[in-house]
Every structure is written in structure tokens, then in C-alpha cells.
Amino acid sequence: MVAVCVLSLSLAGLSVSAEPVKVGNPGFPYSVPGSFLTVSRQVKGQYGFKTHSGLWIRNVSTAWREDVCRLVPSVGGRDVEVTECVMRDGWIEAVTEKGPIEFAFARPDLLLVRSKSPEMHIRFEFQRPRQKYDFPSAFGRRIDYLHYNADRLLMDTRVGARDPDKGNTVRVHPSAGGIEVAILDIHTGDWDGAEPTGSFEDAVRTQKASFERMLASLPSVPKAFERARHEAAVLFWTTIAGPRGMFRRPMMLMSNNWMNKTWSWDHAINSLSLGYHDQDVAWEQFRCMFDFMSPEGMMPDMVSDEEIYWWAVKPPVHGWVFSKLRRMKEFPRERLEIAYDLIGRWTNWWLTRRDFDRNGLVEYLDGCDSGWDNSTAICMNRPPLETPDLQAFLILQMECLADLAKTLGRGEESAQWTARSQKMLDALVRVLFDANGAPRVRRLRDNGFDSASLSLVTRLPIILGKRLPEKCRARMIADIKEKGFITDWGLATESVNSRHYKTDGYWQGPIWGPATLIAVEGLRACGEDALADEIALKFCKLVTKSGFSENFDAKGGGALRDPAYTWTASAFLVLAHELN
């Protein structure tokens, strides 16, 4: 009861903003589910943007990985600045002093661009050719066929008129009704000669309904965080790429900026926030990276629509995530069978391919394997390393498999997974906690230990809760409380008291959503609900201040790195919902 009172008082100072979501502005591109095209206002030098400032259409396929064209409005021969973009119901406006330019997707591959002003002209400045065979071509009065090495775009000037082909710039002039242009993204095959169809009004209705479904599918949150929930829905809605190239199903990218890929633990975290009300979408996101699993059971580090990266892996959080998804709503038997097979193969890969000294504990070969790329616990010790977080995830994963096997009527297999989980738990406590209960990292190269690390990653075994001996739990809880991990904004990934702490140090200090989520889950499993609520609430307040950035300054709360990152939003939604 006391914790509830503290929480309600802590929320009292927060208010819900009525401002429109700033999608389409620097760092937060606008798109719709299934599309690879985005629209955003860019500022040169901001968020790594290198070309001219202005309003840009981009393609997030890694085959492009760059801007497609800049839209420059002009009135009376003078260029007009786009000052901001505003999301409406199913479309966005690029605001200028002479009236807006409007964008709506008739379908994922068809973007409509409209100005109702009879005075506004628009130049479509396509990027300079990368190769001599990258060029725009013109067909008659309306059609421009823009052939690039990576893709093809068809530009249909529906309302207004365009100049004849002049290099890489297409100039569209208004009629009495203004301008309307349809841009068709042609990824495979060739143009069939048919003009793209679909009205702007129909596009708005379709996308409005699509967004409302996304918003309704997300979990409830305290009223003070409702605007952040809405922004999370916009972020999710704009970052789901359709089946194309390597992608066999819709896949939520981490970002429509430069982190335009999916990683092999990010996807699992994202599935959690979707699982409360839309199990089908959650299942697609949970399963998507398993599409690329090797015959041996290895999952790649990351995947784009054009490439698979095998040089690293990511931590096996999938059993923990799937167990949590099952608690939200049980899956049909067919999906349980699939999950049992996939998670089982992934687990066996770790047990057979990453236990180099055959001592029952598995190893990371690289910081990226841990997901904490440059964590001091990893990079200061030099892999291969046995770390307590890795064993904790596998223990929970084997428990998940034991429970799945039991549900599926495979009693003998269930008992085997239970025994393997217990065996690893015993080894974890014996080897990777010292006599005082402190977590430590073991180096295979010299059989040495590091128990002095001030990286939060070594405290993540707290997710095992009361499976661990009391002294181990007590030590990690005390470390979190007393060793400089908790700041005004949440949990630092490296203690602020550490000599290795860096404000913008990636995993050497900044606050990350998934790390916060795992730690909070662990504190709850240990009965530390008040502390869990405190940390969760701080993180939720942080994203209302600084958005859904990749990570955050642990001391100042400022946004760092990629400014619109989906798993940050997912961590927020789960944390906020469980506060609710």
C-alpha cells in the first residue's frame, strides 16, 4: 500500500501534452507499415545527416541506405522553408509559410504528395547518380521513371505539370487545383505501364484505420504517460517493413534512421509490448529472426532486407520473453510446438557450440554477443568469457522449454530440461559468484575472475529471483541501491562512480530501456517491488522528457544516439503498463 501511495504522488506532477506528435521531423521519419519509403524534414549535421537540409524522401532498404530526393517548395520564384512536419489522422503535413505539403500512403509502395496551393511549385531533386547507369527517364507528360542501381521509382504527376527531363531534378508546377504526385516504389520486376491508382482521401481513411488498430493493440499505461504511449504507437507503425528481400514476414526495424535493421534480441523485446492485446503481431515479431536460424541452431547477430550478419550473436533472452508472452495469453498448440522447436535448437546451439571448456557454463566470444557491445565487464577482460547474465538467460530458457514440453505432453523431455536448468544454476552459483555472493566474470584465457566490475550487466542474474541463494540476491540488490547505478533518471549501465563511466559511452554509462526492463523484472522477482517501481517510474518520466532514443545520459537525462528506437518504446510500454 505504501508503494502505491508513493507512486501516485510521483505521478502527480506529470501532465499529458496536447502537442501533435513530431513525426516527420529530424530523427523521426514518417512511414506506414510495410513501406520502405519515409518522409522527414532533415537538418544538415543533425543525427548524422550529411546532405542538404530540407524535406526528404528516403528509402530505408540497406540497398539504398541514403536519401532518394529532396522536395523544395517555391512561390513566386523564391524557395520556401519547411519549418516542421505534423502528423494528422493518417497523413502528415509539411508546414510552410505559404501553405502545407501533404503526404499520405495509398499503399505501402505508393506515396502521394499534394499541395492545394495554386501558387506553390515543387522541385524534386533526386540524389546525384552513384553510377553512370543511375538516371531518371521521362515518358510523355506525366510519367517519370527513375532508375537507380538499387531500386526503381515511378513518379506520376497527376495534378499540375512538370518540366521536361532536366538531369536529376523534376520540376512540378501547379494548376488551379495545386499539385498532386504519386511516387511508386518498384523493388522487383519492371513497370507494367499501368498508372498507379488510389486517391488521397482514400489513402487517409485507410491509414487512419491502420494506425488506430496499432494504438488499440498497445497496453494501457498511467494517464500521465498516455502521450508517450501514443508516440510509441506512431514509432511502431512507421517502422514495420514488409516482406521483401531477406525479410519473409513483416519485421519491425529498430529505427528508420541509420539503425534500419533487426537484431536477434531487439525483436524479442519488441514482441513483449505487442503481446498484451495482439498476439498475432507479437508472434510475428517474436518469430521473425528465427527465420534465419542456421541448421546448427545459431541465430545471426542482425538482419537487413539485403544482408545477414553472422559474425556475432545476441543473448538468449527468448525463453524469458516467450514465458512472459504466455502469461499474457496462452498460444495455440501449433505455435507452442513451433516455439518449442526453435527455442530448443537455439538453446542446444549455446550448450554444444559455446561451452569450450565443457564445464557446464557457456561463453561470450565478443561484446556484441552479450548485446552490451562495449560493456567494461566484457572489453576489460577479453573474451571468451563466462558471465553470470548469459547463464541466467539460459537457465530461464531451459525452464521455458521444460514448461513447454510439459504442456505438449512430453514429460520425459520436460524432466530433462528441468535437470539441465538446475545443473547450470548450480554451476552459476558455484563458479560465477564469490564467497560473499558477489557476481563475477570468468576469463578462459587465464582462468581468472573479475568481481570488481561496475557494469550493470553483471547484476542482471537478479532476473533469476529467488532461485538464487539469499546472499547472492542480497548482494546484487545492495549493489544496485548503493554503488552508483541509480540516478535521477534510472539505471546507469556503468556505475556513475566507476572510473570507466562515460556520459555518451554506449554501454559504459547511458541508460538503456531493455537493461532497465530486465533489472526491474529481476527486482520484482526478488520481492523488491518498491525499488522496481521507483526505477520503472524514472524511466517512464525519462522518455516523456527525451523521447525514445537509443539510450540516454544517465546523469542529465538527455537523448543519445539514434533518436527514434523501437525497443526503447517497447521497454517503456511494458514498464508503464506494469506500473498501471
Positions of predicted regions on the chain:
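Bacterial N-terminal signal peptides that target proteins for export
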Residues: 1-5
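Terminal accessory carbohydrate-recognition/targeting modules of carbohydrate-active enzymes
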Residues: 7, 13-224, 561, 566
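Extended, well-ordered alpha-helical scaffold segments
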Residues: 203-206, 210, 224-231, 278-290, ...
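Extended glycan-interaction surfaces of carbohydrate-active proteins
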Residues: 221-260, 285-308, 356-386, 426-511, ...
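Alpha-helical support elements that line or immediately flank enzyme active sites
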Residues: 261-292, 456-469, 516-529, 536
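Substrate-binding cleft of carbohydrate-active enzyme catalytic domains
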Residues: 265-291, 313-357, 382-400, 572
